[in-house]
Amino acid sequence: MKYLTTENAKTTKGESLGYLTAILYLAPSALSGRNVCSHASEGCIASCLNLAGMGAFSNVQDARIAKTRAFFANPRAFVEQLAEDIAAAERKAERAGLELCVRLNGTSDLPWENLGGEAGVCLMRRFPHLRFYDYTKNPARVRAYLAGRLPANYSLTFSRSECNGEIHFR
C-alpha cells in the first residue's frame, strides 16, 4: 500500500510555487480505534479536515483507517514503507523540477521525530536534504523544536485550539 499522496487540491497549489508536497493522511483522533491525536480538543475533532475534499468518500476513509492500523500493527515496517514512498516522491519531484516537502501528520499528530524504521533512525535524519513540516497541538514537541532538539530539516507549527490559548512560547 502506498502511504503518501502528492495529488490533491492542497498539494497542487504548492506545485505552482515550485514544491511537490507528499502528505500522509491517517484516520484522525481515535477513528481507527487507536488515537493518533493525543492533544485533540473537542473543537479540533469537530472541525477536522479528515472529511474535506476526497476525504468525504468511504473508500478514502477505509484507506486511512487501514494505514493507521498498519502503523500500529508494525511501526517499523510502516516507517520503512514511508521511506520507500518518500524516495519515490523525491524522484517524481526531480523529474518535474520541483522541491519535495513532506508532511507526515496530514490528519494526525504523531511524534515522527521519535519514530524509526528498521535502522531505528527517524525519516528526517534519513532524508536530511528534504524539508519536513507538520502542525502539532503538543506543546512539548513545539518546545523541543524551539530548543533545537528536533532535526534541522523538520519545522513544526503550533496549532491553536479553544483549550490551548493560554500556552505561550518564548
Which residues does each predicted region cover?
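Class I S-adenosyl-L-methionine
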Residues: 1-170
